[in-house]
Amino acid sequence: MQYIVVTGGVISGLGKGTITSSIGHILKDSGFKVSSVKIDPYINYDAGTMNPYQHGEVFVLDDGSEVDLDLGNYERFMDINLSWKNNITTGKVYLEVIEKERHGDYLGKTVQIIPHITDEIKRRIRDVATSSKADFVLIEVGGTVGDIESMPFLEAVRQLKREENNVIFAHVTLVPEIGPTEEQKTKPTQHSVKALREIGIQPDIIFARSKNRLLEETKKRISLFTDVPEGGIISVYDVENVYLLPEVMVNEGFISYLSKLSGKEIKYRDSWKAYTENIKHPKDRVKIAIVGKYVDLHDAYISHKEAFSHVTGNTGIAVDIKWLDSEKVKDDQSMLSDVDAILIPGGFGYRGVEGKIAATRFALENHIPFLGICLGFQVAVIEIARDIIGLQNANSTEFDPATKYPVIDILPEQKGIKDLGGTMRLGSKKVLIKDGTLAKRIYGTDTIYERHRHRYEVNPNYISIIEKAGFVFSGTDEDGIRMEILEKKGDESFIATQYHSEFKSRPLNPSRVHLHLVQQALIYKKNKDIGEAVKLRSSV
């Protein structure tokens, strides 16, 4: 078993997570069993209560863990399912150590960063290695070398190499290109590696992030000042889509160099070849609006963005996302007039909800393909109740506790719960699909398992009323009590789900509802183009 530790220097946001994921994909595609660990140096226990503007999307695993979005990248690139063990935070580590101290596990010793905190970090890393039985365990250390929050984790992985001698260190740095000649500057990388060496870590590989491919002269200079052989300086230049990165790394000689370091023969099968060709050379394009309240930070909805990439890779239909602030859509639905489909993603809180309801109404009135996810499912129910059934001011008790028509209400088991972290209906749940429905045609089966993250549900008192209005709840939980899928009778282009199908979308197995939305968007676009052509001819 081999550990590969990925650290980052110079600045944050260089793409450590994507590089780690790409390493994992290359190894998995070469026949190795892989697992991964994301170390987040924040004191939060997990990502569950974080504002998306602070940290991007909260990703949900099968076991209900609310984790950093990088674990979503790991699952997608490596096609594996992870658990709570794969996300280590300062909060988890310190809480465990403090609880052990309270239990008397340290026998009266003074509890310190070294050895108690570092030992707990190593224990958690080794637990992943043991339980996964992986050939390679990838460890991404969040933050930037030099950050005070990361120091205990860097010390722990330094000790790990000293104790086991099966650790490869990979360091991600920035090579800026300055001036009109775009001269590649190596000084930031030199200083970053120097800072890493000062804490006892010598990188074995350097992933140099840059706008353009590294010049050979640049590689030689980095090698001279870092003691990393030129073959270990891997140029990671900008690509139009993250799924093209493994191909770049392979072409830059990463496989042969890693084979030498690990002593293992790595034979890459390139199972994504057709997939990446579709991404590079799509044959059609559609425009889909994502209407949310965190659209200024696209990472808040990264799993939807990636799900559309997966559809492109499998169909050759490229998706141009139009990011729309739901608060602005509330007052101006004309923003939606040029799109081929509308997606309403999940979310919490009242802000922006009326805009999402307005977008749903616009889709229904104009027969635009529609997909609602989680809160998007709930606002679809609210819109149907208000404007089709006529229940004026129908709402969710989340937004209006005193509403006359509470078509969405809190889950019974959620009543009385005060804590926010880890208390929702979370993780993979069984969904039963009814025969003769659009959902059955989309999935081709009567049972699926999808990931959830919600506190509210369709009020059972309104189910029959909604279905009498021309809609059908085509999916339920395994008890048939909780509504999971909503569709419009006789309409192939309207569907909403309580679950988050984007969390299980993979490059070679895209989310079925995202795939369906894109296919419907293309039909809508072509019909619209035909209609416009007919109008043009008739006016001549």
Swiss-Prot record:
Gene: pyrG
Chain segments carrying region Amidoligase domain: 1-264
PANTHER family: CTP SYNTHASE, CTP SYNTHASE-RELATED
Residues where CTP binds: S12, D147, I148, E149, K185, T186, K187, P188, T189, Q190, R221
Quaternary structure, from the entry: Homotetramer.
Taxon lineage: Archaea, Methanobacteriati, Thermoplasmatota, Thermoplasmata, Thermoplasmatales
Keyword ATP-binding: yes
Gene Ontology terms describing biological process: 'de novo' CTP biosynthetic process; pyrimidine nucleobase biosynthetic process
Keyword ATP-binding: yes
Other notes: CTPSs have evolved a hybrid strategy for distinguishing between UTP and CTP. The overlapping regions of the product feedback inhibitory and substrate sites recognize a common feature in both compounds, the triphosphate moiety. To differentiate isosteric substrate and product pyrimidine rings, an additional pocket far from the expected kinase/ligase catalytic site, specifically recognizes the cytosine and ribose portions of the product inhibitor.
Broad enzyme group: ligase
Pathway: Pyrimidine metabolism; CTP biosynthesis via de novo pathway; CTP from UDP: step 2/2
Residues annotated to bind L-glutamine: Y53, G347, L375, G376, F377, Q378, E398, R455
Protein name (database record): CTP synthase
SUPFAM superfamilies recorded: Class I glutamine amidotransferase-like (SSF52317), P-loop containing nucleoside triphosphate hydrolases (SSF52540)
A GO term, aspect molecular function: ATP binding
Catalytic residues (UniProt): C374, H500, E502
Residues the record lists as binding ATP: G13, L14, G15, K16, G17, T18, D70
Residues binding UTP: S12, K185, T186, K187, P188, T189, Q190, R221
Annotated PROSITE patterns: GATASE_TYPE_1 (PS51273)
Record-linked Pfam families: CTP_synth_N, GATase
CDD domains with a match to the protein in the record: CTPS_N, GATase1_CTP_Synthase
